[in-house]
Amino acid sequence: MDPLQLLQPLEAEIKGTKLKAHWDSGATITCVPEAFLEDERPIQTMLIKTIHGEKQQDVYYLTFKVQGRKVEAEVLASPYDYILLNPSDVPWLMKKPLQLTVLVPLHEYQERLLQQTALPKEQKELLQKLFLKYDALWQHWENQVGHRRIKPHNIATGTLAPRPQKQYPINPKAKPSIQIVIDDLLKQGVLIQQNSTMNTPVYPVPKPDGKWRMVLDYREVNKTIPLIAAQNQHSAGILSSIYRGKYKTTLDLTNGFWAHPITPESYWLTAFTWQGKQYCWTRLPQGFLNSPALFTADVVDLLKEIPNVQAYVDDIYISHDDPQEHLEQLEKIFSILLNAGYVVSLKKSEIAQREVEFLGFNITKEGRGLTDTFKQKLLNITPPKDLKQLQSILGLLNFARNFIPNYSELVKPLYTIVANANGKFISWTEDNSNQLQHIISVLNQADNLEERNPETRLIIKVNSSPSAGYIRYYNEGSKRPIMYVNYIFSKAEAKFTQTEKLLTTMHKGLIKAMDLAMGQEILVYSPIVSMTKIQRTPLPERKALPVRWITWMTYLEDPRIQFHYDKSLPELQQIPNVTEDVIAKTKHPSEFAMVFYTDGSAIKHPDVNKSHSAGMGIAQVQFIPEYKIVHQWSIPLGDHTAQLAEIAAVEFACKKALKISGPVLIVTDSFYVAESANKELPYWKSNGFLNNKKKPLRHVSKWKSIAECLQLKPDIIIMHEKGHQQPMTTLHTEGNNLADKLATQGSYVVHCNTTPSLDAELDQLLQGHYPPGYPKQYKYTLEENKLIVERPNGIRIVPPKADREKIISTAHNIAHTGRDATFLKVSSKYWWPNLRKDVVKSIRQCKQCLVTNATNLTSPPILRPVKPLKPFDKFYIDYIGPLPPSNGYLHVLVVVDSMTGFVWLYPTKAPSTSATVKALNMLTSIAIPKVLHSDQGAAFTSSTFADWAKEKGIQLEFSTPYHPQSSGKVERKNSDIKRLLTKLLIGRPAKWYDLLPVVQLALNNSYSPSSKYTPHQLLFGVDSNTPFANSDTLDLSREEELSLLQEIRSSLHQPTSPPASSRSWSPSVGQLVQERVARPASLRPRWHKPTAILEVVNPRTVIILDHLGNRRTVSVDNLKLTAYQDNGTSNDSGTMALMEEDESSTSST
């Protein structure tokens, strides 16, 4: 507008009311008639200076029109009936030409777009006119910024303000580029020079054209800013929903974030420092947590009425099939963006073309592909020199991961380099360079992918190799894939069966498919013939955890998913066969120094109280080159399963192989044992011999022994040979059959202790002879083959002795009742001598009651540490902390004299050995203790601390792990110190350093309820100069003080341990005890099965063989004495060891 026209009244409108507006060059804020602001709420107050003075006035945010154009601005109320306009609120009335640093070649960009467009000639001319018509929309200068006329955004920071950050070192090459950006933004009001309590570091990033982009590291600010709920849609979702018409256009909103104003109250958060001056943003900064969401939401809202438009941050995509319609919609978009205050960069835009770049991909009619720009970046990659460069390369490659079927396998060697990096240094070889170039070549040759069609069903094709899974997604009826996914199996998954690997791959594919399906059905094609039959897979054939199988099987019940067998899936190349004993099968037995054939067998035990009778057979054979038997063993194992016998036989052979020089072959007919030894044993050894459920393996001691043997002698080969074959079938048939025969013989060796039948006693009763225990006054008769006794209490049955234990067990097992209830139930029908005694004996052997019932005996009394007779004999030491930082200190070393309880406190910065020695050196200048007692912390168990104590002649003593009671004196002092510090430091916990002397004085002059004296009195014999000091000792001479002090100390000496209870028990070797179950679940046994005490360490500590077969040192507090002590059994392993000793002695003779 001509400047003279600004002197004339302008047409304005507020809330539908027309009035006049005047342009005031001196106004700093727009003023409107106060009648229009009665229903508005002020947003802030402002100090207004006029010729009449200064005055605080409310500021409002109002929307109105000037010359038919919408204006949104901050306003004040005025008594006039017209509007006074602030020139900055209507800059379009009188625009000054924008002058920035670098002018962009706008005309060249427009010519390029006109040449590249696919529009017909007539529409090209219309496009040229649009360029001229909307000249104000295009970016004319680098760093040019729009001005979005909306209510300013307020940046909320939550309850905690961010901390100012130091500036990073800046590359000198970046400074000229950054200075130009700052100067241009200052001219446009995007930046202002303003001091702030906050500071954010500037982080220049190089651009491909050699210039530098100004980026600010707002991570510290973003930590304190609440994330708004509205977030941008994922780019994959946008790409799958865009319209792919004949004509496509992409527009780039340059510096879009900087067009959005923020409130003045938010300026301080955005501050940064450049060249010694601090600047703040008046617009939405890049790098701010919520900037993308706020900006995208505004653009989407502006263009919501335009069809076939998608916006993602500052990129806008529009497509139509008709060229005229496409131009008409483009003009609408240009008009909306211009009125909104945005600026469009034609340099990065593409208008009405058949193929365009959007969100990093080349968008075509059918789908998406890698752009030429991206492919050129790949070709420009050079071998990395450090870890950061390698991570940058992997990040670039990862963008195209879905374009090739085996991406994860190709990049796995490069990720291995990252995992093995030593700091920023990497080990890069020529093979790695070749691998990188191969990946780049494969990606540059990758075909385009099809976009997801939401109108069709989703197809998934799944296959797997021993090390990886392969997934491809298709639209139904299409041959071009939507995407590829390649999944590398983890260490646990690599042990799965081939079917389980397919199910794992299928699971990974279906997780992604749920997003891609868009409500349509999912059809899964795989090499699995029948998914329903998989449910019946036997448990021994499953390697995966049950929870995985539950997850896999839930897909069968999902109505959205259908499973199909596809035998046409391409065969995967280079898939190795199932691992077998290749080494053993390719070598002749004569090439081994010795061959052992092993087998195990078990039969039903003739004793009804036992399940099995197991035995193992081992044949030591040598091929020289004929088959020759060197030695053979047939060993009974007792009540064990055939599986244990198979494992024990291999273990026996492994131990024998250790004595033989040269390679040894061990042959077993157990597929489980051979597979476990060759495949599973290394995994078990690495994870502590746990199964897939993270529980200890069965027969863990045997497997540990086999693992040790294989480690000591790596040339032991264990192979599987099918058993029970016809003679001369293979080289190993004869040896295998011999081992089977020896094992069967061993299983039939049963040790039975027979007792004479008592039926003869019953016959004697019927004949008038009375064995001991049968009263003569009772009448004994035979009725229906049962012996009946008539007693004063009634008629009862006298059962044979062989049936009595079964009768008691049946009565007891109904409800696992106690001895009295069980006795009453049995005696209601039966009688025999010593019935109550037999009931008690039987109940004491009930396994369920043993592991569930509480003990009725107490453990021995707690051993008290021997209390020293003199001060300085023994010190207890420990650390308190970490505490809140105070004067740079975090911990306190507490030293307590054992006899007196006197405390010394030393603040330290860390619980280290050097800090401990430094503090104790100060203390030992007074006196050197004989003993130092501590826990097993690193500060007290180091070699440095041990050397220091040895030099001082101090004996070190440590408490039992996880048993703080053994350091009770210092632990109680720690509690007192923390409690006293808490009370003294309410509201100021970081001031504890200054109060340590006060705390030490208070503790040393506090009376002990047990001794009735203070630690200061016990150490020095007199009170300190504190309030409530004892005045009775003030008139005593020093000799009298010392005599009184010795009398007091003697009276405080206590015995080592209190007297034992009448119901306590003392441990001894051979006693049967039961260990308490740690944290038993509900309705679970509270005690483990009985085991014998192997060694008594002290009256309260013993060594037992735990339920896993390991020797463990335990406290008697966690044991109960087994009620029945006469049922000890021999150790099977001991029997086996004894047989080996007999054999060795035989061979030596």
Curated annotation (Swiss-Prot):
- Domain Peptidase A9 span(s) in chain numbering: 1-143
Q: Which residues form the active site?
A: D24 (for protease activity)
Among InterPro entries, the record links this protein to: DNA/RNA_pol_sf (IPR043502), Integrase_cat-core (IPR001584), Integrase_H2C2 (IPR041588), Peptidase_aspartic_dom_sf (IPR021109), Retrovirus_Pol_polyprotein (IPR050951), Rev_trsase/Diguanyl_cyclase (IPR043128), RNaseH-like_sf (IPR012337), RNaseH_domain (IPR002156)
Q: How is it modified after translation?
A: Specific enzymatic cleavages in vivo by viral protease yield mature proteins. The protease is not cleaved off from Pol. Since cleavage efficiency is not optimal for all sites, long and active p65Pro-RT, p87Pro-RT-RNaseH and even some Pr125Pol are detected in infected cells.
Reverse transcriptase domain residues are 186-363
Where Mg(2+) 3 is bound, by residue? D873, D935
Q: Which domain of life is it from?
A: Viruses
For this protein, the record's Gene3D superfamilies field holds:
1.10.340.70, 2.30.30.140, 3.30.70.270, 6.10.20.110, Acid Proteases, HIV Type 1 Reverse Transcriptase, subunit A, domain 1, Ribonuclease H-like superfamily/Ribonuclease H
Gene Ontology molecular function terms on file: aspartic-type endopeptidase activity; DNA-directed DNA polymerase activity; metal ion binding; RNA binding; RNA-directed DNA polymerase activity; RNA-DNA hybrid ribonuclease activity
Q: Which GO terms describe its biological process?
A: DNA integration; DNA recombination; establishment of integrated proviral latency; proteolysis; symbiont entry into host cell; viral genome integration into host DNA; viral penetration into host nucleus
**Reaction(s) catalyzed by this protein?**
Endonucleolytic cleavage to 5'-phosphomonoester; DNA(n) + a 2'-deoxyribonucleoside 5'-triphosphate = DNA(n+1) + diphosphate
* Region entry Disordered, spans: 1127-1149
Q: Which of this chain's residues are annotated to bind Mg(2+) 2?
A: D599, E646, D669, D740
Where, in this chain's numbering, is Mg(2+) 1 bound? D252, D314, D315
Q: How is the cofactor bound?
A: Binds 2 magnesium ions for reverse transcriptase polymerase activity.
Site label Cleavage, positions? F596, Y597, H751, C752
Entry keyword set: Aspartyl protease, DNA integration, DNA recombination, DNA-directed DNA polymerase, Endonuclease, Host cytoplasm, Host nucleus, Hydrolase, Magnesium, Metal-binding, Multifunctional enzyme, Nuclease, Nucleotidyltransferase, Protease, RNA-binding, RNA-directed DNA polymerase, Transferase, Viral genome integration, Viral penetration into host nucleus, Virion, Virus entry into host cell
Q: Which cofactor does it need?
A: Mg(2+)
Reported function? The aspartyl protease activity mediates proteolytic cleavages of Gag and Pol polyproteins. The reverse transcriptase (RT) activity converts the viral RNA genome into dsDNA in the cytoplasm, shortly after virus entry into the cell (early reverse transcription) or after proviral DNA transcription (late reverse transcription). RT consists of a DNA polymerase activity that can copy either DNA or RNA templates, and a ribonuclease H (RNase H) activity that cleaves the RNA strand of RNA-DNA heteroduplexes in a partially processive 3' to 5' endonucleasic mode. Integrase catalyzes viral DNA integration into the host chromosome, by performing a series of DNA cutting and joining reactions. This enzyme activity takes place after virion entry into a cell and reverse transcription of the RNA genome in dsDNA. The first step in the integration process is 3' processing. This step requires a complex comprising at least the viral genome, matrix protein, and integrase. This complex is called the pre-integration complex (PIC). The integrase protein removes 2 nucleotides from the 3' end of the viral DNA right (U5) end, leaving the left (U3) intact.
Q: What else is known?
A: The reverse transcriptase is an error-prone enzyme that lacks a proof-reading function. High mutations rate is a direct consequence of this characteristic. RT also displays frequent template switching leading to high recombination rate. Recombination mostly occurs between homologous regions of the two copackaged RNA genomes. If these two RNA molecules derive from different viral strains, reverse transcription will give rise to highly recombinated proviral DNAs.
Its recorded name reads: Pro-Pol polyprotein
- Source species of the chain: Simian foamy virus type 1 (SFVmac)
